[in-house]
UniProtKB/Swiss-Prot annotation:
Signal peptide (UniProt feature, chain positions): 1-16
Subunit note: Homodimer.
Organism: Chironomus thummi thummi
Entry coiled-coil feature ranges: none
Lineage: Eukaryota, Metazoa, Ecdysozoa, Arthropoda, Hexapoda
Protein name: Globin CTT-VIIB-3
Length: 161
């Protein structure tokens, strides 16, 4: 049993390696190109995964087209994008690691309380990466940087769910 615990810690440690300055720059610059599209980002997530939309009481059971242009939708989309923007802005600087860990840990705790699953976080990731890859200059280097950033984030979030 101890072996598996150590193995799990080694895997998480290997996954959760900080972004280099170059990787952080790729994530930050690509995010900057789309972060003003809050409503479109959240709409893309909901369109791809209606089960995620169903987790939001104010949007559950409603047609996406009927809520996309509402103030409530824009407000929530801005909250999500602002959170991502804050974490992304802190990335690439090792002295910010504890701040990122605190923010992302709270994200996991908050979403556990709402019954969000690791699978739904995976769906969010898939939808976000699909959105990014269709709206920014997306090459292997950008994809690798985003995958590393998301791996790091999910290594903190998923165990808390």
């Amino acid at each position: 049993m101890k072996f598996f615990a150590v193995l799990a810690l080694c895997i998480v440690g290997a996954i959760a390696s900080p972004l280099t300055a170059d990787e952080a720059s790729l994530v930050q610059s690509s995010w900057k190109a789309v972060s003003h599209n809050e409503v479109d980002i959240l709409a893309a997530v909901f369109a791809a995964y209606p089960d995620i939309q169903a987790k939001f009481p104010q949007f559950a059971g409603k047609d996406l087209a009927s809520i996309k242009d509402t103030g409530a939708f824009a407000t929530h989309a801005t909250r999500i994008v602002s959170f991502l923007s804050e974490v992304i802005a802190l990335s690439g600087n090792e002295s910010n690691a504890s701040a990122v860990n605190s923010l992302v840990s709270k994200l996991g705790d908050d979403h556990k309380a709402r019954g969000v699953s690791a699978a739904q976080f995976g769906e969010f990731r898939t939808a976000l990466v699909a959105y990014l890859s269709n709206h920014v200059s997306w090459g292997d280097n950008v994809a690798a940087a985003w995958n590393k950033a998301l791996d790091n984030t999910y290594a903190i979030v998923v165990p808390r769910l």
